[in-house]
Amino acid sequence: VLGIGFYPAAAALFPRFHDRGWMFSKVLGIVVSGFAVFALGSFGLVPFTAPVCLITVGVLILASWIFGCFKVRVHAPEIDFLMMEEVLFFAFFLLWTYLAGFHPEAHGTEKFMDYGFMKAMMRSTAVPAEDLWYSGSGINYYYGGQFYAVFLTKITFTDVKQTYHLMRTMVASFAFVLPFSITYHLAESRACHRIRKEGGNKSQIAPVLGGLLSGGAVSLAGNMHYVIYGCIRQWLGLNESAYWFPSSTRYIGYDPLVENDRTIHEFPSYSFVLGDLHAHVVNVMFVLLVLGLLYSYVKNTCRDPEKEWKWSLKDVLLQPQIIAAGFLIGVFHWSNYW
């Protein structure tokens, strides 16, 4: 519903995409409507309740369609491409939901904290909600990711015990289909540019394969740590103990040990498997939306590859894609302040 409601706005931001931003409209609807409720609640203008969330969503959807009817002229989306994206999204949503079922308990790492924040926000009508550990004080944390999960929970009249895992599997699905869409259009634009110069026939094989590869790289792949430490070193008999999958995020500065120079790299698929619904996890789909907006801006600006770009700061800053990306980067300071 959010995707349909915000489709006119997305179509204005992705005019040269085959689906006119259909898949991105879902994320756009979540981030804009959720932030509107958060902002109104933070100023004490409205309570954080399901009716208020639904009214806010309804007003924004109405504004999107009024804007679309009177201000935007776009071509209809290509249904075949749109359906391909929907099938991929649903397939990976089912896949990640199935995997989440192997360890559904909110136990270990930061799952209890994430679950606790969500339950506190479900009980509360104020923004921020009362801290579950520091009673009498509001949550003092970058809790935007959990807030969006609770926002979707309230507008669907469900409970955290049902939506905790559905939120993380939805993000994992977006982590596949949004890179697929971006890379598909990148590869196709490259192929069209080559055909214009050298001639030949247009093929969809390379764009589709490129999209599947990039989607798999973000949603499923990680790094080469398991290949080296879990397979090769194990086969050579160099590992002293059994392989522990979180080690793949803790080897820079850890192996070999380097004092005062260590880092933790929690790539998306690690977090999806681990089960934390933390800020950096939910923010993955918002970051991909920013990347899509930036590519849409480039694709929309560079209509003639042979023509030299004439940059004007004023023109750049007034482009809708840049304005939307600026808004999202501002949201990141609340949703993932890393």
Regions found by a protein language model. Name each.
Residues 5-21, 38, 42, 71-72, ...:
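Transmembrane alpha-helical segments of multipass membrane enzymes and assembly factors
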Residues 46-52, 76-83, 199-209, 315-317:
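Membrane-interfacial entry segments at the cytosolic side of transmembrane helices
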Residues 81-84, 91-289, 294:
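Active-site lumenal/periplasmic loops and adjacent helix-entry segments of GT-C-fold
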Residues 1-80:
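Membrane-embedded, hydrophobic transmembrane alpha-helices
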Residues 7, 33-41, 148-153, 268, ...:
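Hydrophobic, membrane-inserted alpha-helices
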